[in-house]
UniProtKB/Swiss-Prot annotation:
Pfam families on file: Bud13
TM stretches of this protein: none
Coiled-coil features, chain-numbered ranges: 130-198
Signal peptide stretch: none
Chain's gene name: cwf26
Protein name as it appears in the record: Pre-mRNA-splicing factor cwf26
Length: 306
């Protein structure tokens, strides 16, 4: 009944209009992680990188102040030191994989001289130094290019098994084999020659050595030359039949002991010392000795009575 006599205004005020009770609701706890530092990549962990980051940021944000003084009045060395102190360029920290040593940048080495800022006019020493550095870099790069080009053009030779062949060693081996082949051919040629040809060749070489000491002028009455011509044997010499002072050519004979024979002929120098006869020479000498002994005994008996 009471609710039936309630006006519409009271009903709306009761259901929808509420007074502020002064109580605040508790904030719902955050279920996410809030990043307090903007350094997501972790650059601030390393002192060197964080220092560089802050300095570069400060340099970028700082206003550029240009003094009224002229660059000519300022010392170049002082400017360089100022720039090094402000920039504080970090050391190269790139490392090769698997190595603890720091690998320096090739670009930094090659362009180190050009990276130095130049202000105003350059002195003669600075221009000379810069030109010399550029010339050294160009020579170094050209030498590297020539070496790489030579290696790329070098032909690789391989044998049937696929093994690489060194041309220098192969040429040396070929020269050695050719020399051995020539030596063998010369030795075979000497063996094929006769004894007379070998002796004549040796005599010719000996004569050449002797001619080095003789005087240059030789005349027809030279006694040594005449003696040499007289001792030379000729096949059509008419006096060869009645000459008595013909020199006897000595032949190489055996120098050791050799058994005697009827004709008193010495064995040659190639004899090996083995007697291959049937013993006839020994029997012949034995018979001759017996005959001489009998004759001597008969003679002694004949004169015994005298």
């Amino acid at each position: 009944m009471h609710s039936a006599h309630m006006s519409n205004a009271d009903y709306i005020a009761k259901k929808y209009l509420r007074k502020d009770q002064g109580k605040k609701k508790k904030k719902k706890e955050k279920d996410f992680v809030e990043i307090q530092d903007e350094d997501v990549a972790g650059w601030d962990d390393d002192n060197s990188f964080s220092l560089v980051n802050r300095e570069l940021t400060s340099l970028h944000d700082a206003p550029t102040i240009v003094a009224n003084e002229s660059l000519k009045d300022r010392d170049i060395d002082a400017i360089y030191q100022n720039i090094e102190k402000t920039t504080n360029k970090p050391a190269q920290l790139w490392k090769a994989v698997g190595n603890d040593e720091v690998v320096e940048s090739e670009q930094q080495d090659s362009h180190d001289a050009e990276s130095i800022p130049q202000f105003g006019l350059l002195t003669g020493k600075q221009v000379t130094f810069k030109a010399e550095e550029r010339r050294k870099r160009e020579e170094k790069s050209s030498n590297l290019d020539e070496e790489e080009l030579r290696k790329s053009r070098e032909t690789v030779y391989r044998d049937a098994t696929g093994r690489r062949i060194d041309l220098v060693l192969a040429r040396k081996e070929a020269k050695r084999k050719l020399k051995e082949k020539e030596e063998e051919a010369r030795r075979q040629k000497e063996q094929q020659q006769g004894v007379v040809q070998v002796r004549q060749q040796k005599e010719y070489l000996k004569e050449l050595e002797r001619q080095k000491t003789v005087p240059l002028a030789r005349y027809e009455d030279d006694p040594e030359y005449n003696k040499e011509l007289k001792e030379r044997s000729r096949w059509n010499d008419p006096a060869a039949s009645f000459l008595t002072n013909k020199p006897v050519s000595s032949k190489a004979t055996y120098q050791g002991y050799a058994p005697p024979n009827r004709f008193n002929i010495r064995p040659g120098h190639r004899w090996d010392g083995i007697i291959r006869g049937n013993g006839f020479e020994n029997k012949w000498f034995q018979r001759q000795n017996e005959r001489k002994a009998q004759e001597h005994e008969a003679h002694m008996w004949a004169i015994e009575d005298m």
